[in-house]
Design a protein with these regions (language model features):
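Membrane-inserting effector segments that mediate pore formation, membrane fusion
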Residues: 330-343, 348
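Structured, helix-rich domain cores that form ligand/interaction pockets
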Residues: 1-329, 347, 356-395
Length: 395
């Protein structure tokens, strides 16, 4: 069975791309997947080169003397040639302090950040270990032959298969959403009363940035088609990247508990960090599985057939993010509404003989092995580059 999925644009609604999903038998040993089919994207991942980078890192340093931020900034920029954004913490008279947060954009390596730390230690002295306040990792996918269509299809697939372990629904600001230009974000999921109607879900737009998680969350994901750089939103200007530099990008910003999950608290912790761990924790992609159509037609319970049909349609339109919203609504109903229904039955002298959670939408998801493996490979390459840089520094 073939499913052709439309991939819409936000800024030019008349424009449309598409990608195909092939529904085919799944070969899996896990009991819950036996006899099921998988919706597999028709996309040759070998047509892309993936590269992982540290997009930026924010560290906090405690110096041995009181100074102003511009002196720290000048020292780093003049001697190491690294642009940085510095903020004094707990500043006193003359905006002077001993504690500063320093954000380094696109640092060459962790080893280079350690060089920054050494420079500040020599120049100002250090009274405590340098801590990591936040960090952003990116994985970029470049078509081997520059192509708008190749990027559009890969992004459309990523938007539908990205899987987040975070709670995206308790905090309304964390909900999966799309943003473009200066417009208000458009949420992927509908009002909860329409959770079982795929027509009320919003399909991700190819020329929008897709967010999972709030700006202030400890973990936030972003997906985009990166075709511009050095954007100035206030002036409405940007530089269009050359075709060979245009790529699909997925970013994860970590702070607080997000850093703790990868074992990072201090800058020194990053020397032994496992970069490949990021794939399993954050850069995770999953595919939807469904019973074969002949099995669906033979199911005696119409509810089960309806559930499978709706899940398939939501996945194809709004992806895993849409499915997990529907599951959130379903669980909310079980927690809040079902006890009242059971109490009502009890008061009427009746009872529900069997109470089961059943198979959830999350249970029907399986790892997108091909994409996950390529992301892991890109992260391993990053880890190897970092190890070489540390070795050259003598660390």
């Amino acid at each position: 069975m073939i499913h052709i999925v439309d991939l819409p644009f936000a800024k030019t609604p008349q424009r449309l791309a598409d990608v195909t999903f092939h529904e085919k038998p799944l070969r899996a040993k896990q009991t819950r997947f036996v006899g099921r089919s998988v919706l597999q994207p028709v996309l040759d991942l070998d047509n892309f080169n993936l590269k992982a980078v540290i997009d930026w890192i924010e560290i906090v340093v405690q110096l041995g003397k009181v100074t102003q931020f511009q002196h720290v900034q000048r020292k780093i920029e003049d001697e190491l040639g690294q642009k940085c954004f510095i903020k004094a913490i707990g500043a006193g008279a003359g905006n002077a302090s001993q504690t500063f947060s320093i954000r380094l954009q696109e640092p060459k390596s962790v080893a280079f950040v350690l060089e920054v730390e050494r420079l500040l230690d020599v120049s100002f002295g250090m009274t405590a270990a340098t801590t990591v306040n936040a960090i952003e990792f990116s994985v970029d996918a470049y078509p081997k032959i520059p192509s708008d269509r190749a990027r559009e299809q890969l992004l459309g697939v990523m938007q539908r298969t990205i899987f987040s372990r975070e709670d995206l629904y308790t905090n309304p600001n964390a909900r999966p959403r799309l943003a473009w230009d200066n417009s208000s974000p458009k949420y992927i999921q509908p009002h909860r009363m329409h959770a079982y109607n795929e027509r009320h879900y919003t399909a991700p737009k190819l020329d929008a940035t897709m967010y999972l998680g709030a700006e202030a969350d400890d973990v936030m994901l972003r997906l985009m088609d990166k075709i511009i750089d050095t954007q100035n939103k206030a002036e409405g200007t940007a530089v269009t990247l050359e075709p060979e530099k245009q790529r699909v990008r997925i970013e994860v910003t970590l702070q607080g508990s997000g850093l703790k999950r990868i074992g990072v608290a201090t800058l020194a912790d990053m020397k032994a960090m496992s970069f490949t761990r990021l794939q399993g924790e954050f850069f995770t992609f999953r595919l939807f599985t469904t019973p074969p159509r002949n099995q669906m037609l033979s199911q005696t319970k119409s509810g089960a057939r309806y559930e499978d049909k709706i899940n398939r349609e939501i996945f194809l339109k709004a992806g895993v993010a849409g499915l997990l919203f529907k599951e959130h609504v379903r669980k909310s109903w079980r927690v809040n509404a079902k006890p009242l229904a059971l109490l009502n039955l009890k008061n009427r002298g009746r009872r529900l003989k069997v109470l089961r959670d059943g198979v959830t939408a999350a249970d029907q998801l399986i790892a997108y092995k091909g994409l996950n493996e390529r992301v892991t490979r890109a992260l391993r390459d990053l880890e190897n580059r970092e190890r070489r840089a540390l070795k050259s520094l003598g660390v």
